[in-house]
Amino acid sequence: MTLRFYDTASAEVRDFVPLEDGKASVYYCGATVQGMPHVGHVRSAIAFDQLTRWLEFRGLRVTVVRNVTDIDDKILAKSAQSFGPDWDAEPSARQTEEWWALAYRYEQEFENAYESLGVQRPTYEPRATGHIPEMHTLIQRLIDRGHAYPALDDSGDVYFDVRSWSKYGSLTRQNIDDMQGAPDADPRGKRDPRDFALWKGFKDGEPVTAKWESPWGAGRPGWHLECSAMVTKYLGPRFDIHGGGLDLRFPHHENEMAQSQAAGDEFANFWMHNGMVTYEGEKMSKSIGNTVSPAEMLELASPRVVRYYLGQAHYRSILDYRPTSLQEAAAAVERIDGFIHKASSKVGTGAPDVSPQANMPAAFIAAMDDDLNVPQALGVLHETVRAGNTALASGDLEGAKAALYSVLSMTEVLGLDSVKRPEAVQGREHAALEVLIEAQLEARAAARANKDWAASDAIRDTLAAAGVVVEDGADGATWSLKRD
């Protein structure tokens, strides 16, 4: 089956044919590092991590770029709040955080969140502040082509002229006259209120460290310009996929596409957007107190459970969070892990005789090829787990082995094997744990053989108190670790 993805620009699912044979180029918007990561950030990262993994599984060499917006009005505002009345004081007298330090601190928080949930590092992760010359070049190209102009009030701002580009609004299928004015700068100096800032002139009271010299005066780049300059530097003027959250379609992605194409770049062949996360059907909002952060989720469940939950819905659909969501995800992960452990103890986990592609069920491949239909793919995964358990119960070790290898292949491509999982038996520490538990089970088996039921029950109870669940079967006892 041909890979097919939904393209926001054409509003249809269409065949994905890489621009370069055997390769795929993907850019998705990273964070504006002004605060702690929220659940929407990590859901988006997991969605595009699933996309990357699937493209790689299908034999493509994937180049991924995820930017870091480390200079922005919101970052400066957050830093200014920390300065309070001491903004103009000598640095030694301030109990504050400079904007660049604040941005870097939150950037590390995002990196930690991504890593804890098994999101692969991108090929390139450029910071906006490291690409100012490329932004200047792009602005000049737009001015030269008649699509941008310095502000009429000598403020040092440079704006994109939306009416100069006839395709403006095409990504989100809007008419210019129906749009509201751009909120990113004072409307003075604009030809049209909808024109958006490419360059923001330095203003009195702003930190001098947050300005760069330019042909139009000292200042800093506009948010939309940053992404266009960075993506074309690393992926070129035309690339396969541009992604991000649904909330970025307008104005951010609309403006990105307009300024890039107006500058002469073909830009993205596909636009892919992931859905939002809601709380019991309502939009998450700090003001009404119905938000949940990745850190809070990780206090309630293991990283693998959180990744399973955030990645279980179709990437384009809304993911609704409820107080029981993580419990339900934990039960699903436990079913998978329980089978993997039981089957591994019977047939081993050595390298399979065939490739991961051969182990992957055809129905799973068809689901993932069809616009990353992860819910359908997970259905195949759980059906394989059920079939594997049935094979184990009937003593069909070859059937159990085939199911095990299929399950391992599916969890790998979904990224569920790469998440830190302290409950899994892996590594030297867990190997030692396994030896100790198996020794206890051998002692219990000996007690049962001698009909010493009290000793047998005592060993079982001791293991249970340590979080080890023992199950007796026709072929002996198996064990697994209890999940919270």
From Swiss-Prot:
CDD domains: CysRS_core. Monomer. It comes from Paenarthrobacter aurescens (strain TC1). Its cofactor is Zn(2+). The keyword Transmembrane does not apply. It catalyses: tRNA(Cys) + L-cysteine + ATP = L-cysteinyl-tRNA(Cys) + AMP + diphosphate. This is Cysteine--tRNA ligase. It is found in: Cytoplasm. Its main location: cytoplasm. GO terms for molecular function: ATP binding; cysteine-tRNA ligase activity; zinc ion binding. GO terms for cellular component: cytosol. The keyword Cell cycle does not apply. GO terms for biological process: cysteinyl-tRNA aminoacylation. InterPro entries: Cys-tRNA-ligase (IPR015803), Cys-tRNA-synt_Ia_DALR (IPR015273), Cys-tRNA/MSH_ligase (IPR024909), CysS_C (IPR056411), Rossmann-like_a/b/a_fold (IPR014729), tRNA-synt_1_cat_dom (IPR032678), tRNAsynth_Ia_anticodon-bd (IPR009080). Gene3D superfamilies: Cysteine-tRNA ligase, C-terminal anti-codon recognition domain, HUPs. Zn(2+) binds at C29, C227, H252, E256. ATP binds at K286. A motif ('KMSKS' region) lies at residues 283-287. It holds the Pfam family CysS_C. HAMAP family: Cys_tRNA_synth. Keywords: Aminoacyl-tRNA synthetase, ATP-binding, Cytoplasm, Ligase, Metal-binding, Nucleotide-binding, Protein biosynthesis, Zinc. A motif ('HIGH' region) lies at residues 31-41. Binds 1 zinc ion per subunit. It is an enzyme of class 6 (ligase). Its EC number is 6.1.1.16. PANTHER family: CYSTEINE--TRNA LIGASE, CYSTEINYL-TRNA SYNTHETASE. Belongs to the class-I aminoacyl-tRNA synthetase family.
